[in-house]
Amino acid sequence: MSNKVKSDIEIASKAEILPVTTIAEHLGLDADALELYGKYKAKLSYDTIHSLKDKEPGKLVLVTAINPTPAGEGKSTVTVGLGDALSKKDKKTVIALREPSLGPTMGIKGGATGGGYAQVIPMEDINLHFTGDFHAITAANNALSAFIDNHMQQGNDLDIDGRRIVWKRVVDLNDRALRKVVVGLGGPIQGVPREDGFDITVASEIMAIICLASDLKDLKKRLSEIVIGYNYKKEPITVGEMGYEGALTLLLKDALKPNLVQTLEHTPAIVHGGPFANIAHGCNSVSATSTALRLGEYVVTEAGFGADLGAEKFLDIKVPALGKAPDCVVIVATIRALKMHGGALKTELSEENVDALAKGFTNLQKHTESIQTFGIPYVVAINKFITDSDAEVAKLEALCEEHGIPFSLTEVWEKGGDGGLELADKVIAAVESGEADYKRIYDDAWSIEEKLEAIVTKVYGGIGVELSSKAQKQIVEFKKYGWDRYPICMAKTQYSLSDDPTLLGRPTDFVIHIREFIPKLGAGFVVALTGDVMTMPGLPKKPAALNMDVDENGNAQGLF
């Protein structure tokens, strides 16, 4: 390798990419199973998905992480690299990932298809518009907003209270100026004035529904159950009462189909759906994972941010819908993030600091304990960065050995699948041990308060929950409607185990503050908003978009 570090897009643009029909052949599928979007991208047809339903599922590996730095810790990179390593071990492997959101791509991340020599391609297409799934979800979401405002303009037969509409518009960008807006201005013919707001598309309930629906029939049913707001008697109003579930299903009929692409090393990858894990449930679609499990011997998937967010939601929300629990969990840890948790400044994370690393190790310990609470064996993947010193690597390995934590030093960013062979061996051993004995940390029959308590004490390591007066009133209301039977989806900062993003490491004796609940009945969960978490992010001072361009031949530049 050259001393110059190549960017992700430089590596991806020089890679040999096979026709997606060839990738499908590796899975035993012919061209008729695909709906092509050019040479290198395809959707799997409904006939294909239905034909696989009775096949025995393969083994499932979930990749999660410790609480990350703002730049992320390489969870997607490890997912891809592990998939390629398993392929090299002669395991028929399929990777199942989420689709990237344009918001963070243009904002801070610059892309989300893995990195270095562990990427999913065509990365340029996947990071931008891909097969149009997010645009379809945005259109369906905003069509519903238009239907709501039109209903109020045209007589308001359902007595919708404009002050109590909870459905927001969305756009797949980070745009803080749209968090709170007023619509319907300009006089009687322009609509009924009311306060509104925008979320990012990946926070839309329709995104969550796409990711949890099993088929078109289930999609339509879930869409009909969306609560859009309340009438003047404070009774909930659903999409089904308005009668628009059919139109919304029509807009989403292609977006429900999973997308097939490949890694740099030609491992099949099914990339579909993309809810954030801090403000939604953070997992790719049930349809994608289920299909992958019936096409591969091993499936490697990921859940967003740390194990306190994406993994908890995968295990408590997605697994019941999927009907299959992971056989092994991989927890990605980086030396730079552990140093941050040990008190090192974010501007100094590339400098050697063994003491900060040792102090921050407690964050990793907590995440390993949380995964064990769910009864699933795990392996820690130490995702090696070029800034990691030999002393830091040796210290982290020694700490893992001292505390009986199974680990593997992973170099997939630099070496692709070859850098993850040891990790693959340890994952295979964990899977084949048969030790997985999955159990949820709460039952759906429990009260909302009991579910919150379970998540906070067992996964976050806190001592309890504090409810705002609004949240307390909502619990009474939700019990009346039977909404307390749904799982809880916590909306919480990704940077801390607590709801305070500045409280790093392994904090203790903290409480989680619930400011309000949002019923997402179509998705099948209740969102609990904590702290100051936002459902529409903002851009940083210098967005990643400043470095993006396109050359005269139409080739993208600056995606990373």
UniProtKB/Swiss-Prot annotation:
It comes from Listeria monocytogenes serotype 4b (strain CLIP80459). Coiled coil: none annotated. Pathway: One-carbon metabolism; tetrahydrofolate interconversion. InterPro entries: Formate_THF_ligase, Formate_THF_ligase_CS, P-loop_NTPase. PROSITE patterns: FTHFS_1, FTHFS_2. It catalyses: (6S)-5,6,7,8-tetrahydrofolate + formate + ATP = (6R)-10-formyltetrahydrofolate + ADP + phosphate. The lineage of its organism: Bacteria, Bacillati, Bacillota, Bacilli, Bacillales. Its EC number is 6.3.4.3. It is an enzyme of class 6 (ligase). Belongs to the formate--tetrahydrofolate ligase family. This is Formate--tetrahydrofolate ligase. ATP binds at T69, P70, A71, G72, E73, G74, K75, S76. Signal peptide: none annotated. The gene is fhs. Keywords: ATP-binding, Ligase, Nucleotide-binding, One-carbon metabolism. One of its GO terms (molecular function) is formate-tetrahydrofolate ligase activity. HAMAP family: FTHFS.
